[in-house]
Amino acid sequence: MKVMVYEPGHPGELREIDNTLAACQEVVDGYIETMHLTGELLIVCNEEGRLYNLPRNRLGICGTFFVCTAAGEDFDGLSDSQVEYLRKTVR
């Protein structure tokens, strides 16, 4: 699935990742936690980022996070227009 990955101190990067729990955990380097960014966009981050003092990132999140969408109870990839929206708004 196509996601935007945000690492502390680096610009957002468009990546293709597998839509599996293991792949999501690998990106955030730990257990995942989700939050709504907008009605359709989800932030997926490390649920223990603050506990482990991971570097502070955008939006007050600690550690690497990515943005995707939801398809029911599953994650889904971003559309081209969603990628453009994120490139303009999440810096």
Go through the PLM ranges and name each one:
Residues 1-91:
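Short beta-rich binding modules
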